[in-house]
């Protein structure tokens, strides 16, 4: 079965945000590097996806200089690097065409954020008929503030707020939502030791 690794938003933009200090997986680049090495060694496709917000002046604006793969990661020659402007790597991109032209039937998804772009891409891939594997320990997220929380609070206050959704809860919820419905949940070790 032909498969592709789809790496979603593992980019320097996230490291520039104050909440990265509370990331569930600050060493995500190492996990992704290990996956990429394995896929390359097996001659399998890798697609790198970057999130962009042109003209916003944020760390996701290409003008910021942070819209690039995290330090320690590099696309090899022939590996597509595509940009997206939504939470879904299929929407506003040519990802579907790349996968179809390569005869891909299974996608392996990893990236940032666990419950946003990585999960959304996973759900859409399943809806498009792909067999999907979600590499839970090669994703990362940060705490989510309650919808009624005041904006601009320091990270310590966000983390202390009992209404904040903590990273372990986010990851568990994502696993429950995806497993057996949209994807098979696997770990880096399981995929690299096959």
What are these regions (language model features)?
Residues 1, 19-48:
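A short alpha/beta connector and helix-capping loop motif
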Residues 7-8, 44-51, 135:
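Short beta-strand segments at enzyme active-site cores
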């Amino acid at each position: 079965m032909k498969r592709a690794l789809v790496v979603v938003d593992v980019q320097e933009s996230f490291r520039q945000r104050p909440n990265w200090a509370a990331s569930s997986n600050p060493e995500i680049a190492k996990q992704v590097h290990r996956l990429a090495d394995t896929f390359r060694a097996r001659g399998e496709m890798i697609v790198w996806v970057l999130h962009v917000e042109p003209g916003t002046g944020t760390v996701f604006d290409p003008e910021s200089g942070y819209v690039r793969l995290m330090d320690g990661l590099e696309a090899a020659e022939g590996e597509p690097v595509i940009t997206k402007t939504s939470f879904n790597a299929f929407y506003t991109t040519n990802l579907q065409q790349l996968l179809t032209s390569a005869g891909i039937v299974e996608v392996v998804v990893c990236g940032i954020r666990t419950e946003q772009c990585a999960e959304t891409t996973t759900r859409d891939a399943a809806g498009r008929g792909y067999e999907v594997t979600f590499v839970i320990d090669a994703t990362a997220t940060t705490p989510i503030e309650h919808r009624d929380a005041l904006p601009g609070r320091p990270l310590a206050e966000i983390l202390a707020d009992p209404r904040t959704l903590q990273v372990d809860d986010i990851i568990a919820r994502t696993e429950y939502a995806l497993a057996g419905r949209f994807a098979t949940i696997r770990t880096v070790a399981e995929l690299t030791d096959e």
